[in-house]
Amino acid sequence: MTVTLMQHTSLTICAHAIRTCWQSFEKSDGGGEKDRELIDRVGNKNKHASTLEHLVYTFYIQGISRACLQELARHRIASLSVKSSRYTLKELKAEEEFKEGDWERAKRYLVETESEAVNLASLKALENLRQVLLLGISNDMAKYCLPESYKTELTWTINARALQNFLTLRSSKSALWEIRKLAKTLHEALPKEHRYLFCLNQEG
């Protein structure tokens, strides 16, 4: 799993939006300590969380499973553009047969779990899918055979308010292990000067 922060909004934009309400622009210190404290006080402590929506982050997420993608898609206040399996299954079609000991080669396509039985089942499903592709069945139809562990990637854009909600819920120990890992990796990818606005679930 790899997460790359592609773009983010400056804290000065959020501070400016908050100061618009009181027309207190002269008190700004250009995104310094005063503005940082203002954002935290108004957006977090005073619960005017809509002001945090002016902060927007775009991430490029690679190497998560389709199972994790389904969990991610439940967070609807975000925009996601996902790698199309319909157009990329030709990569798999060109592979040699996957046998039981071929996990290292299969990891290009599959997310590895802690369960050997699950990994073996995923490997068999991957080979079954490859065989279906070799029959000349269209990618549009063959993708119905994709295992949930099949890797994908996406560009994901989310505002700070929605990201706070995501990180709190998905860093919990009750969340899927893979999305817990994603939550932690997203938090680490945030700009250092923004991280004070976000907390991971301590139970995670």
Swiss-Prot record:
Tell me what reaction this enzyme catalyses: dUMP + (6R)-5,10-methylene-5,6,7,8-tetrahydrofolate + NADPH + H(+) = dTMP + (6S)-5,6,7,8-tetrahydrofolate + NADP(+)
The catalytic residues are 170 (involved in ionization of n3 of dump, leading to its activation)
Q: Where is this motif: ThyX motif?
A: 74-84
Question: Could you give the cofactor binding note from the entry?
Answer: Binds 4 FAD per tetramer. Each FAD binding site is formed by three monomers.
Keywords annotated in UniProt: FAD, Flavoprotein, Methyltransferase, NADP, Nucleotide biosynthesis, Transferase
The reply to whether Transferase figures as a keyword in the UniProt entry is yes
Could you say which enzyme class this protein belongs to?
Answer: transferase
Gene Ontology biological process terms from the UniProt entry = dTMP biosynthetic process; dTTP biosynthetic process; methylation
The UniProt record gives the binding positions of FAD as: 50, 74-76, 159-161, 165
What PANTHER family does this protein's entry cite? FLAVIN-DEPENDENT THYMIDYLATE SYNTHASE
- List the HAMAP family: ThyX
Q: What is this protein called?
A: Flavin-dependent thymidylate synthase
Which gene produces this protein? thyX
